[in-house]
């Protein structure tokens, strides 16, 4: 289906009285303006829009102004996202104190996701209360200490990709929303949407989902139906949350218009879905599949960064990288001393000096027990920092063997 848009992109400085704004360069929820649109009645209206946006889309069918100067957005040109944090969150729990609650929240979310999929397969409606039970403890844990939750998540990755991917994406959405300064209810909606974004896959054949190799064109077309199926499940279940619906319906859209199902581009893609596209791709890269190995979290961030201003909105990519850090929690790294370690807690002031668990000697021989080192609090003459990221399984090391005994 081809949709003919009646919108024109206009820089705020080129707005004129009489124009009707139907879409912003960000979510309406980030502004004080009404969700249904905004008529420009005066220069004061233009000034107010300029406090939040660089550009907008005007409805040409409702536009009474003449000589609109359209601006062409090249696919390689960044589109600004000047979000204003409503809140700046601080950790309220120590990493060590939050670990038990983070583990419980992770296990709860995984069990709830399994319950959700089983119910849908049996023809039952999606119970949004089950989704809330899965999401809220996880959001609460991430709000208290994101490092603790992602440490647990890195050690409990399962072979059941659908469940694990859903839970990981949900937690990443909570962390991303926290970093962006969204209010907690919005963060819960983002987490719920990311938990459910692939729920439509429950309606696809198992042999398609478990395929060990690349899909042919016919199989790919069938796989893409999970978006439509997911929206159908939400509608049948009476789920009205706008962010959840936007994420399920548009997380495969791409900023340059190269995604599906509608080929939306730029600000036509809802903000929640633009964020979900980054999250979905990042976690998929970090997760092993039958047809490829997982990449390191650091490498996954580099892959996402390579897609900025094409597949993904550049400013959101930068915010996501800032949220997770150069070497995200759970990353296997080699220190400049030669020792192998895994990142436990971020140091947001000095990204190369996190708190780590050292797993080997300088000669790469496994330690009998790991040693926790805060690289910010080193004593002595040698200054050790993170040297480079390592692929999962490097030097035959499985962190689970150290921490899940």
Question: Language-model features: where?
Answer:
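Membrane-cytosol interface segments
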Residues: 1-126, 380-405
């Amino acid at each position: 289906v081809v949709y003919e848009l009646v919108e024109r992109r206009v820089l705020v400085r080129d707005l004129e009285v009489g124009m009707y704004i139907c879409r912003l360069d960000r979510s309406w929820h980030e502004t004080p303006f009404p969700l249904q649109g905004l008529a420009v009645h005066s220069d004061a209206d233009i000034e107010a829009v300029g406090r939040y946006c660089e550009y907008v889309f005007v409805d040409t069918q409702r536009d009474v102004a003449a000589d609109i100067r359209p601006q062409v957005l090249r696919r390689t040109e960044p589109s600004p996202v000047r979000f204003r944090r409503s809140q700046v969150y601080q950790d309220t729990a120590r990493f060590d104190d939050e670990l038990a609650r983070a583990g419980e929240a992770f296990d709860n979310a995984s069990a709830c996701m399994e319950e959700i999929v089983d119910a849908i397969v049996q023809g039952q409606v999606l119970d949004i209360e089950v989704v809330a039970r899965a999401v809220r403890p996880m959001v609460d844990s991430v709000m208290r200490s994101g490092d603790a939750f992602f440490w647990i998540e890195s050690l409990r990755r399962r072979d059941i990709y659908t469940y694990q991917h859903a839970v990981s994406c949900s937690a990443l959405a909570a962390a991303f929303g926290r970093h962006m300064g969204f209010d907690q209810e919005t963060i819960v909606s983002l987490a719920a949407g990311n938990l459910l974004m692939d729920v439509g896959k429950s309606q696809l054949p198992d042999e398609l989902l478990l395929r060990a190799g690349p899909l042919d064109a016919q199989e790919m077309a069938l796989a893409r139906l999970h978006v439509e199926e997911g929206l159908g499940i939400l509608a049948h279940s009476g789920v009205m949350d706008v962010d959840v619906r936007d994420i399920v319906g548009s997380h495969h859209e791409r900023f340059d218009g190269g995604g599906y199902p509608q080929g939306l581009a730029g600000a036509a893609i809802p903000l929640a879905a633009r964020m979900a596209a980054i999250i979905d791709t990042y976690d998929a890269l970090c997760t092993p599949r039958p047809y490829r190995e997982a990449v390191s979290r650091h490498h996954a961030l580099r892959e996402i960064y390579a897609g900025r201003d094409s597949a993904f909105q550049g400013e959101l990519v930068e915010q996501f990288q800032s949220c997770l850090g150069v070497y995200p929690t759970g990353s296997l790294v080699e220190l400049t001393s030669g020792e192998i370690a895994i990142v436990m807690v971020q140091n947001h002031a000095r990204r190369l000096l996190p708190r780590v668990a050292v797993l080997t000697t300088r000669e790469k021989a496994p330690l009998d027990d790991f040693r926790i080192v805060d690289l910010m609090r080193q004593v002595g003459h040698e200054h050790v920092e993170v040297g480079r990221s390592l692929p999962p399984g490097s030097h035959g090391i499985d962190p689970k063997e150290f921490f899940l005994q």
